[in-house]
Structure formats: C-alpha cells, structure tokens
C-alpha cells in the first residue's frame, strides 16, 4: 500500500488485504451455489478510497477508532446471517464472523498497544506475508 507511513503499517494493511483476497476466493463456491454474482461490487473501490483518506487524515489511533463502529456492525450483521442460515452452510457463515472478528481484534489490540494484533487474521491465511524485519 503506497500510502503507508512506514513498513509496519504497510505490513498491517498488506496482511488485512491478503485476508480479504483469500476470503473472497474461499467464498466464491458458496456464492455460485446460491446464484450470487462472483464479480466484486463497484463499491469496494470506493470503500478502500475512504479508508485511505481516513488513514491519511488522522493519527493511527483516531483512524482505528473511526473504523471500530463499522467493523463491529459487520460482525453483528454476519452473526445474524449465520444464525439465520441453514446448518449445511454454517462452516462458511461462521467463517465470515471469524473473519470480521479478526479486524475487531486487530483494532482492539492496536489501540491497547498490545502485540500480536494481526494474529487472528494471520491464522486464517494460507499465504501469509513475511513479517518485516525490525531495526
């Protein structure tokens, strides 16, 4: 991510983008099963642009604090969908709850100054990014 202020931010954003990419690939069979479109919605580019603008305009903790309500709403929404979904789809539906909870964990741990903020995301990746060397 070219707007990253430093290598650590670049790693964080890269890891979260990797989680998004792998999740989209994992969901495609589920989407096909229900006749849902496989192409990405045009709104995702606009959402990314909004996140980039917020990152550029705010210090790290303010940026994270601004994301928190949105991510919390995603967790709630996917939990409701999982609760309403059929038993045969629970693995996929629950995986989306876990996916969103990884973002909550990242935000909460970063805001608390704790290490391992990306652990919940990394454990879901088949192709994790290499951790940058610290000086």
Descriptions of predicted regions:
Residues 1-135:
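Non-heme di-metal
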């Amino acid at each position: 991510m070219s707007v990253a202020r430093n290598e650590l931010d670049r790693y964080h954003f890269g890891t979260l983008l990797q989680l998004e990419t792998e999740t989209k690939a994992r969901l495609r069979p589920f989407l096909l099963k229900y006749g849902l479109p496989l192409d990405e919605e045009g709104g995702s580019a606009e959402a990314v642009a909004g996140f980039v603008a917020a990152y550029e305009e705010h210090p790290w903790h303010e940026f994270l604090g601004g994301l928190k309500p949105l991510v919390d709403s995603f967790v709630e929404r996917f939990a409701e969908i999982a609760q309403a979904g059929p038993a045969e789809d629970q693995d996929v539906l629950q995986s989306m709850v876990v996916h969103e909870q990884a973002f909550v964990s990242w935000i909460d741990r970063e805001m608390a100054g704790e290490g391992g903020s990306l652990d919940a995301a990394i454990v879901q990746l088949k192709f994790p990014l290499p951790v940058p060397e610290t000086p």
